[in-house]
Design a protein with these regions (language model features):
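N-terminal glycine-rich phosphate-binding loop and ensuing alpha1 helix
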Residues: 124-183
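Conserved core of the sugar-phosphate nucleotidyltransferase
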Residues: 234-307
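Double-stranded beta-helix
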Residues: 6-7, 87-124
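Conserved alpha/beta core of the MobA/IspD/sugar-nucleotide pyrophosphorylase nucleotidyltransferase superfamily
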Residues: 120-128, 280-360
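Conserved beta-loop-beta/alpha segment of the NTase-like Rossmann-fold superfamily
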Residues: 188-262
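ATP-binding glycine-rich loop module of kinase domains
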Residues: 353-388, 410-411, 418-420
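Conserved kinase catalytic-core helix
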Residues: 392-396, 417-508
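Active-site activation/catalytic loop segments of kinase-like enzymes and analogous catalytic loops
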Residues: 534-599, 616-630
Length: 647
C-alpha cells in the first residue's frame, strides 16, 4: 500500500504498511492528550516507544489495569481483549506492528466521544491549500508576465519550496487566478507524484478579493484538517498538523501585520490586526487548522467586516486550543525581499517571466532523490520552440515532457563554457559550431524574415526600453565613455538594413552564447540549451550571422557574471555615461584582448563589420528584458558599439 496519514483527536498515525499478514504504523501523540480506553476482539499488537514519555495503561491477566511510566526504548504487547490506553506526558512517537485487523477497536471511553470501529473522517487525507491567485503587485515588474508562486529561489520555484515540505500523503489544493495555466503546467511536470486540486478563483482584484476570498473558494475541498499558506511564504520546516496553530515571526512594525500575543505554553491569548498597539509576533500567512468546522464557522461570521482570512481568529476562544509556531520565515512577496534572497545559480534574471528551475527527481518505488531535471516555463506559447527540436535534436537535451508553456529535460552532466573558462575549449566550440551548424539553405522569403527580426524587432525593443520610466531614472544620454554617440534614433538611421550580410540556415541556435553551452569532459561533447523559438516568426529558418553575432557578444560580456548585479553598471556624470564591467574569467579576457574571434571570423570569410553591427543590435534588443543595472549597461554598450561601427 501507499503510505497514508490518519488523523486522530490526540495526534495522527502514519500507516507505512498494511497487507493480509500485518500492519505497520507510526503513532504520534501530542503531550497532554490520551488515546481511547479501548480493547480489541482480534487485533494483537506490539508497541515500541521511539521517543517521549508516556503513562501506559494495560490490563493484566487478573483483569487489573496496571499503570506504568515508559520512555524511549520501552515496549509493550497488547493481546485481545486486554484493555489499554496511552497518555502522553511529553510528545510521544510509537512504532506499532499488529495483525491486519485495523478496524477492530471497542472504545470504552474516548475524550472525543468517538464510536467503535473505523472513523471514516479520520481516513480522509489532510490537505494543504496554497493561495496563489493574486497578481503579486508588490513584486512590480517581476510579476508582469508570471505568477509570483513560480519565481525561482535557489533555482526552485517558491511553490515547490512549499510542496517539498508537505508530507507525501497530503492532498494539495491550489487557489489560482492570475497566470493559472502556467502554474498548472509547471506543477504537473515538477511534481507528477502529487495529488493536486486546482480551484479557479473568480475574483482576484478589487474590493472583497484576497486570501480570505481565495480560501473560501476552496472550501468544498477543505472539509478536513488542513494547512493554508500564501504563495510568497517560505519557511524552513512545516510543523505537524496535530493541533491548530499559526506561524509567527518577530516584528517591530505591528501596524503592517496581523499580530498575536501568547502565553509561556505558546497558547494564543489575543489577536490584533494591523495596529500600532499590536504585539511582537506577526502572523506569516501559514496556519494549521485541525478544527476545520469551527474555522469555517468563524470565518463566515467575521469575514464580511474585514474581508481578511485572519478574521477567523478574532474570537480565538471559539477553538479548543490555538498555539503559535515560531518559524524562520522568508517573505518573498516584496521586490526588495525577493531580490535579496533569490540566489539563482543557473539563470540570469529577466523581466520576461521566463524561469529556469532545477528539480530533484524522485524514485517512484523508494521515494529517494535521484538525478535532477531542468524545467523551463515560458509565459509566451512555445510551439515554435518545440518544433525546432526536430532540427536540433542531435545537439540539444532529450526533452522528456512539454506543453504550450513548459518543457523539461534531464539535467545535463557537465558545466557551461563560462564556468569552465578554458581558452582551448572556447576555441574548440567555435570550430565545432562551424562544422556542425550553419549549413546554408535556400529560403524564398528570407528578406521578409530578416526585416521582421532585425529592423522591426529592434524598433519595438527600443520603444519598450524607453517606456520603462519607473526603472530608468534618467532620460537618454548621448555621450558614452566620453564619446558623443548621438541619439539612439540617429544611430539606427545609419543602418542600411538591406545591406546587412545574411546566410539562411535550418541549423541555428538563436541564443548561441557560452552560458547556453554545456561541456561534458567524460564524452568530450557539447550540448546546447535554451535555443531560440524562431527567426522573424519562422521556426524553420535562421541567420548564420545572428549566431555569429551572439557568439561575438558572449566574448565581450560574460553573461554568467551578470547574475551578480554589481558586475555590470553605469555611472552618470556631467552628461556622460561611463560603462563599468567586472569580469572574473581570465580565459575569456585573454581571448577578448587578443581579438582571437575577430581574426577567426575574417579567416573564415565572414563579414566582421556586419557581425559587430548585429552584436550592437543584440545588446540594444536585450536591454528591456533585463533588470537594472544590467538593463542600462546593455543599452549604452549597444549605443557605443553601434557608434563605433559608423564613425
Amino acid at each position: 500500500m501507499k503510505s497514508k496519514r490518519v488523523e486522530k483527536p490526540w495526534g495522527h498515525e502514519e500507516w507505512l504498511a498494511l497487507n493480509d499478514k500485518y500492519c505497520y504504523k507510526r503513532i504520534y501523540i501530542n503531550a497532554g492528550t490520551r488515546t481511547s480506553f479501548q480493547y480489541h476482539n482480534f487485533k494483537q499488537e506490539t508497541n515500541y516507544i521511539i521517543s517521549g514519555t508516556a503513562e501506559v495503561w494495560l490490563e493484566n491477566d487478573n483483569n487489573v489495569i496496571e499503570k506504568s511510566i515508559m520512555n524511549a526504548g520501552d515496549y509493550f504487547d497488547v493481546s485481545p481483549p486486554k484493555k489499554h490506553r496511552v497518555i502522553a506526558i511529553t510528545d510521544v512517537i510509537l512504532q506499532e506492528v499488529s495483525t491486519p485487523h485495523v478496524d477492530d477497536v471497542i472504545r470504552l471511553q474516548d475524550d472525543a466521544e468517538r464510536t467503535d470501529g473505523r472513523i471514516e473522517s479520520e481516513h480522509i487525507n489532510p490537505a494543504i491549500c496554497i493561495l496563489a491567485a493574486g497578481f503579486g503587485k508588490r513584486l512590480e515588474n517581476l510579476t508582469e508576465n508570471i505568477n509570483k508562486a513560480l519565481l525561482p529561489v535557489e533555482d526552485k520555484a517558491i511553490i515547490s519550496h512549499i510542496i517539498d515540505l508537505t508530507p507525501a500523503s497530503f492532498d494539495i489544493v491550489v487557489a489560482l487566478g492570475y497566470s493559472a495555466n502556467l502554474v498548472k503546467g509547471y506543477l504537473k511536470i515538477a511534481h507528477p507524484d502529487r495529488n493536486f486540486t486546482f480551484v479557479d478563483v473568480d475574483k482576484i482584484d478589487g474590493h472583497g478579493s484576497g486570501p480570505g476570498y481565495s480560501l473560501r473558494s476552496c472550501r468544498e475541498h477543505l472539509q478536513r484538517p488542513f494547512y493554508f499558506i500564501t504563495a510568497d511564504c517560505i519557511v524552513d520546516n512545516l510543523p505537524s498538523l496535530d493541533t491548530n496553530w499559526l506561524g509567527v515571526f518577530r516584528t517591530g512594525i505591528p501596524e503592517l501585520y496581523s499580530t498575536v500575543d501568547f502565553d509561556e505554553q505558546n497558547n494564543i491569548v489575543q489577536f490584533s490586526n494591523k495596529s500600532s498597539d499590536g504585539f511582537e509576533h506577526a502572523f506569516i500567512g501559514l496556519a494549521a487548522i485541525k478544527e476545520y468546522k469551527i474555522f469555517w464557522s468563524e470565518l463566515d461570521k467575521n469575514i464580511k467586516s474585514s474581508g481578511e482570512v485572519v478574521s477567523a481568529f478574532y474570537n480565538i476562544k471559539a477553538y479548543k486550543d490555538f498555539k503559535v509556531q515560531k518559524l524562520n520565515w522568508t517573505d518573498t512577496g516584496t521586490i526588495d525581499n525577493y531580490i535579496k534572497i533569490r540566489n539563482n545559480k543557473h539563470s540570469l534574471a529577466k523581466t520576461t517571466g521566463e524561469c529556469l528551475y532545477r528539480i530533484k527527481n524522485k524514485c517512484p518505488s523508494c521515494g529517494q532523490n535521484t538525478d535532477s531535471k531542468c524545467i523551463k516555463v515560458f509565459p509566451k506559447e512555445i510551439s515554435n520552440k518545440i518544433k525546432r527540436i526536430d532540427y536540433l535534436k542531435s545537439f540539444i537535451p532529450h526533452v522528456t515532457t512539454k506543453d504550450n508553456h513548459t518543457l523539461s529535460y534531464n539535467w545535463i552532466a557537465g558545466d557551461t563554457l563560462y564556468a569552465i573558462d578554458n581558452v582551448s575549449l572556447y576555441k574548440k566550440f567555435v570550430e565545432w559550431s562551424y562544422n556542425n551548424l550553419w549549413k546554408p539553405v535556400e529560403c524564398k522569403n528570407f528578406n521578409e524574415l530578416h526585416d521582421n527580426f532585425y529592423r522591426k524587432k529592434t524598433e519595438q525593443r527600443i520603444k519598450q526600453y524607453m517606456e520603462c520610466k519607473i526603472l530608468r531614472k534618467h532620460v537618454e544620454i548621448n555621450s558614452v565613455n566620453n564619446k558623443y554617440c548621438g541619439s539612439i534614433q540617429d544611430l539606427l538611421d545609419n543602418i542600411d538594413w538591406n545591406m546587412l550580410s545574411r546566410i539562411p540556415t535550418n541549423l541555428f541556435h538563436g541564443d548561441l552564447q557560452f552560458d547556453n553551452i554545456i561541456y561534458n569532459n567524460d564524452n568530450d561533447g557539447f550540448t546546447m540549451i535554451d535555443w531560440r523559438d524562431d527567426f522573424g516568426g519562422s521556426p524553420d529558418f535562421g541567420d548564420v550571422y545572428y549566431d555569429l553575432a551572439k557568439l561575438y557578444g558572449s566574448f565581450l560580456i560574460n553573461y554568467r557574471e551578470m547574475r551578480n548585479n554589481n558586475n555590470a553598471s553605469i555611472s552618470i556624470w556631467d552628461g556622460n555615461v561611463s560603462l563599468n564591467l567586472i569580469d572574473h574569467s581570465p580565459g575569456l579576457v585573454e581571448l577578448r584582448d587578443s581579438h582571437w574571434f575577430d581574426k577567426w571570423i575574417e579567416s573564415h570569410n565572414f563579414d566582421l563589420h556586419t557581425i559587430k553591427i548585429l552584436t550592437s543590435i543584440i545588446f540594444l534588443n536585450m536591454s528591456p528584458l533585463h533588470e537594472l543595472p544590467f538593463k542600462d549597461y546593455l543599452f549604452y554598450r549597444g549605443k557605443e558599439m553601434l557608434h563605433d561601427c559608423y564613425r
